[in-house]
Every structure is written in structure tokens, then in C-alpha cells.
Curated annotation (Swiss-Prot):
MF terms (GO), sorted A to Z: adenylate cyclase regulator activity; corticotropin-releasing hormone receptor 1 binding; G protein activity; G protein-coupled serotonin receptor binding; G-protein beta/gamma-subunit complex binding; GTP binding; GTPase activity; metal ion binding
Gene3D superfamilies per record: GI Alpha 1, domain 2-like, P-loop containing nucleotide triphosphate hydrolases
Example GO BP: postsynaptic modulation of chemical synaptic transmission
A Pfam family it matches: G-alpha
Keywords recorded for this protein, A-Z: ADP-ribosylation, Cell membrane, Disease variant, Epilepsy, GTP-binding, Hydrolase, Lipoprotein, Magnesium, Membrane, Metal-binding, Myristate, Nucleotide-binding, Palmitate, Transducer
Binding annotation for Mg(2+): 47, 182
CDD domains attached to this UniProt entry: G-alpha (cd00066)
Protein name (database record): Guanine nucleotide-binding protein G(o) subunit alpha
ADP-ribosylarginine modified-residue sites: 179
List of residues binding GTP: 43, 46-48, 152, 176-179, 270, 273, 325
Region G5 motif: start-end pairs: 324-329
Length: 354
């Protein structure tokens, strides 16, 4: 793979540089300005939290946003199916009906021609629906922890008839579930409870991390996102490293970093919905061999929370933990309300007023 940047990546890089320049120049101007840093490993749900802030604290998605997300939904949907098709070979799973091989070829051809952002033709849509209904494909989908698959694969593939309709327009939930890798730093502004928030979403993949630390010394609080459901999966960028272990290592390095000694840390144990389903079938010992408790949502989630809290080496630093589902607007609204109250209390305490 060459080093040529796409127009989109160049734009992201320019935007990132501009934000970094502004960060260096301005510092927090007053207690009413809240600078929040959103951190976490890749695919922990950070960008979904940003989209929720747009829904909750701004005016939601504009007509232009909807238009821009439409090709992303098409791409996420067909790329998810193509990933399952490729895994059929890798895992040696047979199709329920051998005729599905022709459908699989059609899907992979569209992806290889980079036509994955186009609306589905009637022929392609039928092929995709037949594939998704195939017993072999379903068996392969159920083994998705053994390969890399978008968390929203089932959501989109269950909605093929709706997404494939000629008059399709993405819904709020469709947009929330889109997956686009974040490169560089993305800044979002909004006002809530008389506070002016500046929320910074930073790319989570390893290659992005060196861009983080230097410009965020004066941050008010860090929201650290963890995908609870990653306990039985490996990383995209390193298929020997467990995702939960990576998150724990990253949390350790952020929590105990000299830049963040006095910074409040809010831990979002995210994707609780996926975790609740997964823990019934996939034991926590995959990630934590020493775990002896029951494989129930409550016990396993509490154990994971304790693992993160144990990384905090500062007796004066409190970790504020919330179980979240970033695609659930009501859940994020309630949690963010609580987070804001923590920030206000800490601000008052800092001024000697609390």
C-alpha cells in the first residue's frame, strides 16, 4: 500500500493541523469553557458519542448530513456481507445452498470494483438477501469473533429490503451505526447547562495515538470509551492482541500520564447491549483466564470495571464509570447529564465553592 493520501484524508489532516494550532494558541478561557477529550482504542464507540451530541445538543442531522451518510450505509452493508463471505472460505464453512456461490461472487465483485458506495441494483439486492438468508452464512456470522466484522452488520443486513429501496433515506439510527475510521482530531462544539463544551474525538487505531497527548494538557475531563464486547476479539491492526487487553493498556497509560494527573476521568464501558448478548455464549475467561465468576452480564461487567479501576495509581483521582450503549440516544442523554454534573461539581470544588 502506497503513501498517497486521498483527498478525504488530506482534508482530515489539514483540519487536524488547524485544530492543533488553535489548541496551542488558546487554552481554556474561563471555567464556563469545558474541554472534553474523547479517548479509547479503535471501534470503542467514540465517534458514535460525537454523533449523539449532535442529536441531543444541536439540531440533529441536516439534509446534507443524510445525503453524505447514504453512501456510507451502502458501503457498510455490502462490506459487512463481503467480510462474512470471505470468512466462509477461511473458516471452511459450506453454503446451505451451493447456488449462493454465484451470489457471493457478485457481492465480492462489486466491492473489488469499489462500487460499494452505490445504491444496490435490483439484481444485487436479491443476491444479498438470498445470501443473508443462507444457513451457512448465518453459521459464519455466529462465529464473527473469529474474524473482523462491523458491529452493525446484523442491523444493516436485517434491513436490506429497506436500505435497498429506490427511495431510501438513512434514518437517525442508520447514521448512528455507520462506521468510518476517524483520522486526526475532530472537534465538536455545543452548549449545555450554561457550559460551552468543546469535544475532541481522536483516532483510536494505534497509528493515530502519537497525535494525542501533547496538545491536551489543560483538558477539563477525559471520557475514555471501552467496547465491553471486545473481550473475545482481536485488534484490526494486530490480530495477536486481544481488544480488551489493548484497552486496559491504553487506559493505564492515559490514567497515569503526567499530563493528566489532575484530570477527571470518566469511563464509558460501552456496547453493553452487544456484551449482554455475547456473554451468554462466549465466556469471559477468553480474556481473563483467572475469572471464576458466573458468565452473567452483571458479574462479568463488574469484573471488567474493576480491572480498569485497578489501573489507577493515584489515590486522589476518582474514576467515574458508566455502562453505556452509544447507539441509544436516551441512554447517552442520561449519562451525559450525569457527566456534566460531575464536571460542574469538580469546577466548583476547584474554585473552593463546593
Amino acid at each position: 500500500m502506497g503513501c498517497t493520501l486521498s483527498a478525504e484524508e488530506r482534508a482530515a489532516l489539514e483540519r487536524s493541523k488547524a485544530i492543533e494550532k488553535n489548541l496551542k494558541e488558546d487554552g481554556i478561557s474561563a471555567a464556563k469553557d469545558v474541554k472534553l477529550l474523547l479517548l479509547g482504542a479503535g471501534e470503542s464507540g467514540k465517534s458514535t458519542i460525537v454523533k449523539q451530541m449532535k442529536i441531543i445538543h444541536e439540531d440533529g442531522f441536516s439534509g446534507e448530513d443524510v445525503k453524505q451518510y447514504k453512501p456510507v450505509v451502502y458501503s457498510n452493508t455490502i462490506q459487512s456481507l463481503a467480510a462474512i463471505v470471505r470468512a466462509m472460505d477461511t473458516l471452511g464453512i459450506e453454503y446451505g445452498d451451493k447456488e449462493r456461490k454465484a451470489d457471493a461472487k457478485m457481492v465480492c465483485d462489486v466491492v473489488s470494483r469499489m462500487e460499494d458506495t452505490e445504491p444496490f441494483s435490483a439484481e444485487l439486492l436479491s443476491a444479498m438477501m438470498r445470501l443473508w438468508g443462507d444457513s451457512g452464512i448465518q453459521e459464519c456470522f455466529n462465529r464473527s469473533r473469529e474474524y473482523q466484522l462491523n458491529d452493525s452488520a446484523k442491523y444493516y443486513l436485517d434491513s436490506l429490503d429497506r436500505i435497498g429501496a429506490a427511495d431510501y433515506q438513512p434514518t437517525e439510527q442508520d447514521i448512528l451505526r455507520t462506521r468510518v475510521k476517524t483520522t486526526g482530531i475532530v472537534e465538536t462544539h455545543f452548549t449545555f447547562k450554561n457550559l460551552h463544551f468543546r469535544l475532541f474525538d481522536v483516532g483510536g487505531q494505534r497509528s493515530e495515538r502519537k497525535k494525542w497527548i501533547h496538545c491536551f494538557e489543560d483538558v477539563t475531563a477525559i471520557i475514555f470509551c471501552v467496547a465491553l464486547s471486545g473481550y473475545d476479539q482481536v485488534l484490526h491492526e494486530d490480530e495477536t492482541t486481544n481488544r480488551m487487553h489493548e484497552s486496559l493498556m491504553l487506559f493505564d497509560s492515559i490514567c497515569n500520564n503526567k499530563f493528566f494527573i489532575d484530570t477527571s476521568i470518566i469511563l464509558f464501558l460501552n456496547k453493553k447491549d452487544l456484551f449482554g448478548e455475547k456473554i451468554k455464549k462466549s465466556p469471559l475467561t477468553i480474556c481473563f483466564p483467572e475469572y471464576t465468576g458466573p458468565n452473567t452480564y452483571e458479574d462479568a461487567a463488574a469484573y471488567i470495571q474493576a480491572q480498569f479501576e485497578s489501573k489507577n495509581r493515584s489515590p486522589n483521582k476518582e474514576i467515574y464509570c458508566h455502562m453505556t450503549c452509544a447507539t441509544d440516544t436516551n441512554n447517552i442523554q442520561v449519562v451525559f447529564d450525569a457527566v456534566t454534573d460531575i464536571i460542574i461539581a469538580n469546577n466548583l470544588r476547584g474554585c473552593g465553592l463546593y
